[in-house]
Amino acid sequence: RLNKQFDIIESSGVLHHMENPMAGWKVLTTCLKPGGLMKISLYSELARQHIVKIREEIKELGIGLNDHEIKNLRDIIIRSDKDHHNLIIKSNDFYSLSTLRDLLFHVQEHRFNIPLIKDHLDRLGLKFCGFESKKIVSQFKKTNTQREDLYDLDKWHEYEKENPNVFAEM
């Protein structure tokens, strides 16, 4: 535990791999100065359904963690015409063994939906300040035209349900 507080805290690629993400998030909150900014990256439940399907296939096929098996899996996916395979090919993580291993074989992964994030923010006493991606925000604003819509997690949840891959990149 740090005995220091910060104006800005960024956490990417960590909380969703912890045994208890909420406990980790709570610790980060204690390190945030009042009025500070916390930027958190989490995996989207909806946007990672293609990865869930591929993990099920990996389990069914008994594919292991060695480089040869992972390369063979990658070849199978590249040659496939399945929609969930075509989605993963778009990920930069698909093209490096270490990042593909992390993407498909990580032993622990928690995925989040927006209502759960909203609940966590409320429980932690944090305020949602918006999403960072200009591209995503720009698309959202086409159907959510009021300024306050940008900070309305219920509207974001509806938007994500209509666009399930919007948060595919953490």
Regions found by a protein language model. Name each.
Residues S11-V14, I40:
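A short beta-strand submotif of the Rossmann-like class I SAM-dependent methyltransferase core
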Residues L37-I88:
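Conserved class I S-adenosyl-L-methionine
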